[in-house]
A protein has these predicted regions:
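Divalent metal-cofactor coordination and adjacent catalytic microenvironments
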Residues: 1-214
């Protein structure tokens, strides 16, 4: 059985949460499956991911017509670190030859993210400084902005870790129920529901605002 992938709690944490009486008593494969499924359920519920890319990746983000001075990033492309970060605009050639400079052309928001004591491990909006805009326009409208960065979050918040653990424990306990979710193969089918009251409360501060665009 393959181990956990981009998980927000560990299998050992889940063993402890379930009160395993003797190490190794609980089946490893089902524990791993519960942790992975719970982690992806958290992603789906919050609209973002808390695991960090190992190397910089690139995405194209369309600027907003209504607010060309702000560039909202999608939930799978929040910026986890300024190391390796580049922001470039295009004039229609596809070369993305104009690089924007942090703290000159734009600044990252939330401003205090990834600082000591901050609850946020990522930035999800670029704010143009002065007259800087993100909507470089051509004959066919605005061109997208290319963002290169290690996306995700720099750390997993304690609330996210605990919510994942609670959801994973609930999923594992369902293994004995008829047609329990762990009996079939689609991890994507697992969701945080109204019955997950504690999970919802823990994640309440990390759900992306529906007004965010990207």
């Amino acid at each position: 059985m393959t181990g956990t992938v981009n998980a927000y709690c560990t299998v050992d944490d889940l063993r402890a949460q379930l009160g395993e009486s003797k190490p190794g008593n609980l089946p490893e494969a089902q524990l791993v499956r519960a942790v992975n499924a719970a982690s992806r359920a958290v992603d789906n519920y919050t609209g973002r991911r808390f695991w960090q890319d190992e190397t910089p990746q690139s995405v194209l983000v369309a600027p907003s017509i209504a607010d060309p001075y702000s560039l909202w990033l999608p939930g799978n492309a929040e910026i986890s670190t300024v190391t390796g970060l580049t922001v470039a605009t295009d004039n229609g050639t596809g070369a993305y030859g104009t690089s924007l400079v942090q703290d000159t052309d734009y600044r990252l928001w939330p401003y205090a993210a990834n600082t000591g004591g901050s609850e946020y491990g990522a930035w999800w909006m670029l704010e143009g400084m002065g007259t800087s805009r993100f909507d470089v326009r051509g004959a066919r409208g605005s061109y997208p902005v290319r963002i290169t960065a290690r996306f995700g979050w720099a750390f997993v918040p304690v609330e996210v870790e605990q919510a994942t653990l609670l959801k994973a424990a609930a999923l594992f306990k369902r293994k004995d129920a008829p047609f329990g979710v762990l009996q079939f193969g689609d991890i994507a089918a697992v969701r945080v529901t109204r019955q997950d009251i504690d999970v919802i409360e823990l994640l309440s501060g990390y759900v992306r605002d529906v007004a965010m665009v990207g």
